[in-house]
Amino acid sequence: MDSNTVSSFQVDCFLWHVRKQVVDQELGDAPFLDRLRRDQKSLRGRGSTLGLNIEAATHVGKQIVEKILKEESDEALKMTMASTPASRYITDMTIEELSRDWFMLMPKQKVEGPLCIRIDQAIMDKNIMLKANFSVIFDRLETLILLRAFTEEGAIVGEISPLPSFPGHTIEDVKNAIGVLIGGLEWNDNTVRVSKTLQRFAWGSSNENGRPPLTPKQKR
């Protein structure tokens, strides 16, 4: 096992612990809490894959971080912060829409790279809108938090979420998964649109008809 993979996991475990303390003291906002929950699932998956105990990894991660902070000068820290671009959190969905449980009458699930796609195949002849919460950097989608498909009545009929055991995905992974979700919903004569916000940051433009320019690969 690569030592950098292990140390990266250990540091991530400790930093998650620090962020959890922030939430416990009621200092975190909704996006902060959302990322914390998502990263917890990711860490559990990574720990299982690596065969590492999260609690033990957290203690080692603390030692690594303390050593770095001890050697880090305030001036170097200022320069690092100034040169690092800040990401933004984009919310198409409300907290209620993001956290709501939903059930499928005819479930279908497909894994597309590091993303999991879920579709209720019982849904027919509906107008459906795809909305997502995600982070943006340099005006491009950076990390998908969660994407959901809503009918006009507000029912959830589809979803795309990152796999906890497969951290990291690209903007192309997200667009490919959206294409698969659209294709699965349109198979039952549903009309699918993508929110303007998601179109803008994933494809760089937005169409009034709500349809982004999908490549042949993305239309599967």
From Swiss-Prot:
Upon interferon induction, ISGylated via host HERC5; this results in the impairment of NS1 interaction with RNA targets due to its inability to form homodimers and to interact with host EIF2AK2/PKR. A motif (Nuclear export signal) lies at residues 137-146. It is found in: Host nucleus; Host cytoplasm. Signal peptide: none annotated. Residues 180-215 are annotated as: CPSF4-binding. Residues 1-73 are annotated as: RNA-binding and homodimerization. It comes from the Viruses. GO terms for biological process: symbiont-mediated suppression of host cytoplasmic pattern recognition receptor signaling pathway via inhibition of RIG-I activity; symbiont-mediated suppression of host gene expression; symbiont-mediated suppression of host mRNA processing; symbiont-mediated suppression of host PKR/eIFalpha signaling; symbiont-mediated suppression of host type I interferon-mediated signaling pathway. The keyword Transport does not apply. The keyword RNA-binding applies. A motif (Nuclear localization signal) lies at residues 34-38. Pfam families: Flu_NS1 (PF00600). GO terms for cellular component: host cell cytoplasm; host cell nucleus. Keywords: Eukaryotic host gene expression shutoff by virus, Host cytoplasm, Host gene expression shutoff by virus, Host mRNA suppression by virus, Host nucleus, Host-virus interaction, Inhibition of host innate immune response by virus, Inhibition of host interferon signaling pathway by virus, Inhibition of host PKR by virus, Inhibition of host pre-mRNA processing by virus, Inhibition of host RIG-I by virus, Inhibition of host RLR pathway by virus, Interferon antiviral system evasion, RNA-binding, Ubl conjugation, Viral immunoevasion. Its main location: host cell. The dsRNA-binding region is required for suppression of RNA silencing. Belongs to the influenza A viruses NS1 family. This is Non-structural protein 1. It comes from Influenza A virus (strain A/Memphis/102/1972 H3N2). The lineage of its organism: Viruses, Riboviria, Orthornavirae, Negarnaviricota, Polyploviricotina.
